Design a protein with these regions (language model features):
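Surface-exposed, low-hydrophobicity beta-strand/loop segments enriched in small/polar/acidic residues
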Residues: 1-138
Length: 138
């Protein structure tokens, strides 16, 4: 990076302690939470959470875990709740936190950060593309 003011920064995978048990939570969306002044990873707990990280290596509470934050110039895979088609807007699932789903008409206003790049079924790691976060009314 050419900007000398950008010291101690990095791109790509980051490692943080788990604030909850993240064992088996790979390919789910994670968020950063404050744990007594220390950044930790956790699963989202609300459909309006900002959870831009895809879990790469989960572990028990307090152990180091790793996650990636895909940029808008790359695609990624996230566990899907329900079904989707290419081009569907994807929001955080309210029943399986960390997964995404394609909300149906009438679902209300939800935060959307990804679109589907392929058709998918429940439990699949569906190919997605990150988009600028926005509230969408379904």
């Amino acid at each position: 990076m050419l900007n000398p003011g950008q010291t101690n920064t990095r791109k790509g995978e980051i490692n943080l302690p788990a604030s909850v048990n993240l064992t088996g939570c790979e390919n789910l969306l994670w968020k950063i939470v404050n744990n007594n002044g220390v950044a930790n990873f956790a699963l989202p707990t609300s459909v309006n959470d900002i959870a831009p990280f895809i879990g790469a290596s989960g572990d028990v509470i307090g152990a180091n875990t790793s996650a990636e934050a895909p940029s808008m110039n790359e695609n990624a895979r996230i566990l899907l709740d329900g079904t989707c088609n290419p081009g569907d807007k994807l929001a955080l699932s309210s029943t399986n936190y960390g997964r995404v789903y394609a909300p149906a008409s009438g679902a209300g206003s939800l935060l959307v950060e990804f679109i589907a790049e392929e058709a998918g079924v429940a439990g699949q790691t569906v190919l997605v593309r990150r988009i600028p976060a926005r509230l969408v009314t379904f």
